[in-house]
């Protein structure tokens, strides 16, 4: 099966609504217009995980949350409409190496490692709506050169080197791959897990206030 359309007339799909398309390696396109499981707002854990040929997905308007690992290792997925999505789970798009752009305009929460290894991403815009991001959201996004945060965002901002900081500037969350040379961590600041992973930074100066 390379393509499937689930119409709005369908009232039940599987017994649990979990992992229905897990590891369907030949599936290229899916259009879902029917409720998923018993929850109309949630795309379950690992729903499309391992669908290595999947290029396009059309989700029902009711879906506002993408479960953990929902699209993990969908290596052919180039883009997905996230309009209306408010929460992205842990590792949701991990290993989606063809995913070239993401629209986070309606997203409030992004889980741990959500876009880990999305090597086709070159730039990401974080809008006002995003107020809660987990650990190492963009870990191993080796080609992510530009990260921009809306001036109106109340939770995050950029530092002078283009790094992602919490709003009060006390924690370094992510340093883009384009960063090179020496980086000085200011007094009173901390660094999140893997904050400098994959960068060209050759030296990090750690202040006395920081424990390693």
Predicted regions and their residues:
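Structural signature of tandem-repeat unit edges
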Residues: 1-12, 24-42, 52-65, 75-87, ...
């Amino acid at each position: 099966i390379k393509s499937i359309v689930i119409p709005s007339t369908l009232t039940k799909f599987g017994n649990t609504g979990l992992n229905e398309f897990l590891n369907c390696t030949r599936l290229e396109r899916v259009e879902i217009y029917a409720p998923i499981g018993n929850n109309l707002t949630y795309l379950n854990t690992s729903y499309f995980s391992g669908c290595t040929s999947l290029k396009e997905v059309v989700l029902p308007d009711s879906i506002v949350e993408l479960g953990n690992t929902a699209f993990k290792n969908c290596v052919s997925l180039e883009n997905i409409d996230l309009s209306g999505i408010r929460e992205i789970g842990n590792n949701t798009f991990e290993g989606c190496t063809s995913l070239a752009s993401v629209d986070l305009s309606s997203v409030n929460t992004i889980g741990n490692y959500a876009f880990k290894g999305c090597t086709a991403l070159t730039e990401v815009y974080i809008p006002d709506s995003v107020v809660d991001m987990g650990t190492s959201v963009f870990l191993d996004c080796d080609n992510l050169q530009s990260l921009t945060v809306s001036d109106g965002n109340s939770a995050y901002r950029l530092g002078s080197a283009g790094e992602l900081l919490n709003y009060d500037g006390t924690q370094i969350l992510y340093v883009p791959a384009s960063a090179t040379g020496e980086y000085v961590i200011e007094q009173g600041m901390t660094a999140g897990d893997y904050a400098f992973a994959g960068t060209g930074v050759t030296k990090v100066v750690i202040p006395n206030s920081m424990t390693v």
